[in-house]
Amino acid sequence: MRVWPGRGRIDRAWCAPCEASFARPTNRCKQCSLRTAPGITHCADCQQTAPNWSLGAAAVDYAYPWSALISAYKSGTDVGLGHGFARLMTHNTGTRAILTNADGWVGIPLTPAKLARRGFHQIHDLMNQLQQQLMRPPRILRGALEPLRHASAQKTLNLRERMGNIHNLFATTKGTDDLRGLHLVVIDDVSTTGATLHAATAVLLKAGAASVNVVAFARTPKPDG
């Protein structure tokens, strides 16, 4: 059992009051998944310069209490959180629609050094949890992307710096015949500016994917809210 912040005990799933308080459905941009006003399908940034993927969605904002829980999950301190994260993603209409309408899922990979340090690949676990909770889930294309190098820490960088930081970050291990014509979903735990998702999408489209959508459990809000 774990204790949810100020809300009581949980056992691999959120209680209804906590889900209502911290994972309330909200209107989001259909591409970058930032919060938008009701009735607005695309934020101003995406209307001006659209991402290279088709559709994007996130279940929650990267904020309290999710930020701390995601850190615990990624570090392997509390791997059981993946079940609850996947549950929120499969119950959120935006993320569920994208996840289920695909030929395959591609997870953002970890570098060997980072995987060795953590001993746990949170994206692989999250995709496994998602598959278990969907009736007819798409297949997971394991190893479709591989990291070419370790990117510098992204947290302190702005969007322009991040885009430069992820240049030649990934390669695909699949041939064009393996990916050609497929409708893919790239899955990550957190989308901060979308730079990492952009890099992954570019590689998959170049390899012949018909389309790429993206899903993250959490989306970092803009600094101004």
Model regions and ranges:
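Glycine-rich phosphate/pyrophosphate-handling loop used in enzymes and phosphotransfer proteins
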Residues: 1-225
